[in-house]
Curated annotation (Swiss-Prot):
HAMAP family: RRF
SUPFAM superfamilies: Ribosome recycling factor, RRF
This protein's encoding gene: frr
Cellular component annotations (GO), alphabetically ordered: cytoplasm
GO molecular function, one term: ribosomal large subunit binding
Keyword list, A-Z: Cytoplasm, Protein biosynthesis
The keyword Transferase is annotated on this UniProt entry: no
Top-rank taxon: Bacteria
Any one of the GO BP annotations: translational termination
The name this protein goes by in its record: Ribosome-recycling factor
């Protein structure tokens, strides 16, 4: 096993961290209607908590309105409650088997809360990236102890780990800035 093999093993985990962070960002309100906004909503259905996607179709009606077409009419009330109680500041209204959700404009205070949440998710993702870097360095040091690589290769491996970390941390920082701009846009 070489340093390159270790990097090829760890880098996909770093990419997954970025993807997970992007998914988290998609669920944060910006004032525009997106289906990802309701990704975290869980509905009490048939005795268990189910993701909203498994209870009905979520769609965008216009820039400020989402719709949920609930498949089982008996689930409309529970779905409406779940959306209201999700802590997103949304007030759904049922119309037969369809639920309309108007996305109200964000208050300045709410925008700042969402920016804080974005930064928290970003910091959590950076911690995860640092843990992957630590794992990479640990693997490379193990190879050096087993005399499978030289001391120079160990140093190069550590530098590569740092470079990889900086590359992905930079992506997270850029995503945070982009989301912050979206949130603060009135």
């Amino acid at each position: 096993m070489t340093v390159r093999d270790v990097i090829q093993k760890i880098e996909p985990r770093m990419k997954k961290t970025i993807e997970a962070f992007q998914h988290e960002l998609a669920s944060i309100r910006t004032g525009k209607a997106t289906t990802a906004l309701l990704d975290r909503v869980k509905v009490e259905a048939y005795g268990s908590q189910m993701p909203l996607k498994q209870v009905g179709n979520v769609g965008v009606l216009d820039a400020h309105t989402l719709t949920v077409q609930v498949w089982d009419k008996s689930m409309v009330g529970a779905t409406e409650r779940a959306i209201r109680d999700a802590g997103l500041g949304l007030n759904p209204s049922a119309d037969g088997q369809n639920i309309r959700i108007s996305i109200p404009p964000l208050t300045e205070e709410r925008r700042k809360e969402f920016v804080k949440l974005t930064k928290k998710f970003g910091e959590d993702s950076k911690v995860s990236l640092r843990n992957h870097r630590r794992d990479l360095i640990h693997e490379v040091e193990k190879l050096e102890k087993e005399k499978l690589i030289s001391e120079d290769e160990l140093k190069r491996g550590k530098k590569d780990a740092d470079d990889l970390l900086h590359k992905y941390e930079k992506q997270i920082t850029e995503l945070i800035a982009q989301k912050e701009k979206e949130i603060m846009e009135v």
